[in-house]
Amino acid sequence: MDIDPYKEFGASVELLSFLPSDFFPSVRDLLDTSAALYREALESPEHCSPHHTALRQAILCWGELMTLATWVGNNLQDPASRDQVVNYVNTNMGLKIRQLLWFHISCLTFGRQTVLEYLVSFGVWIRTPPPYRPPNAPILSTLPETTVVRRRDRGRSPRRRTPSPRRRRSQSPRRRRSQSRESQC
């Protein structure tokens, strides 16, 4: 059975595979970040969002994996076999957990659409031959500045330059709408 944990979020394992393994912070850093930013929502009995649920599951999964690794470390007598198991867990399972944690923390922090646009942008950048691409890779934290403009225009007709003669202009300055985030529980 081929299960893609990102499918319901509009991404895929393949899309995340464009990011190099050293791109993702350590599991410890990601766990600390999720606790610092989302502890209340993660510990709440309330359902907040699918990203909170997936993040909870990834954290629980990592805890179980560490319990198993500790058991193996304490019960496997052959040092070579023990090292093989530890290396496999750190290399393969560790990377998968780091990807999952990063994806869901990023979606909660920046918004799912921004993260998906970043993954596509990075994928295009990394596959473009070096002589033809900009020297620096896209940066996730700078994407909202450029994507907000595109989002605002979707589904709307172009704004008129002159006010309609039937409507009077308000004397109060226009308030800028704050962008709602998926991360609010």
From Swiss-Prot:
Any single GO BP term: microtubule-dependent intracellular transport of viral material towards nucleus
Keywords of this entry: Capsid protein, Cytoplasmic inwards viral transport, DNA-binding, Host cytoplasm, Host-virus interaction, Microtubular inwards viral transport, Phosphoprotein, Repeat, RNA-binding, T=4 icosahedral capsid protein, Viral penetration into host nucleus, Virion, Virus entry into host cell
Sequence repeat copies, ranges: 157-163, 164-171, 172-179
Region feature (3 X 8 AA repeats of S-P-R-R-R-[PR]-S-Q): 157-179
Post-translational modification comment from the UniProt entry: Phosphorylated by host SRPK1, SRPK2, and maybe protein kinase C or GAPDH. Phosphorylation is critical for pregenomic RNA packaging. Protein kinase C phosphorylation is stimulated by HBx protein and may play a role in transport of the viral genome to the nucleus at the late step during the viral replication cycle.
Residues with the Phosphoserine modification: S157, S164, S172
Motif (Bipartite nuclear localization signal): 160-177
Region annotation (Disordered) ranges: 135-185
One CC-aspect GO term: T=4 icosahedral viral capsid
Domain of life of the organism encoding this protein: Viruses
Annotated localization: Virion; Host cytoplasm
InterPro entries: Hepatitis_core, Viral_capsid_core_dom_sf_HBV
Region (RNA binding): 179-185
Function: Self assembles to form an icosahedral capsid. Most capsids appear to be large particles with an icosahedral symmetry of T=4 and consist of 240 copies of capsid protein, though a fraction forms smaller T=3 particles consisting of 180 capsid proteins. Entering capsids are transported along microtubules to the nucleus. Phosphorylation of the capsid is thought to induce exposure of nuclear localization signal in the C-terminal portion of the capsid protein that allows binding to the nuclear pore complex via the importin (karyopherin-) alpha and beta.
Quaternary data: Homodimerizes, then multimerizes. Interacts with cytosol exposed regions of viral L glycoprotein present in the reticulum-to-Golgi compartment. Interacts with human FLNB. Phosphorylated form interacts with host importin alpha; this interaction depends on the exposure of the NLS, which itself depends upon genome maturation and/or phosphorylation of the capsid protein. Interacts with host NUP153.
HAMAP family cross-referenced by the UniProt entry: HBV_HBEAG (MF_04076)
Protein name: Capsid protein
Gene name, Swiss-Prot/TrEMBL: C
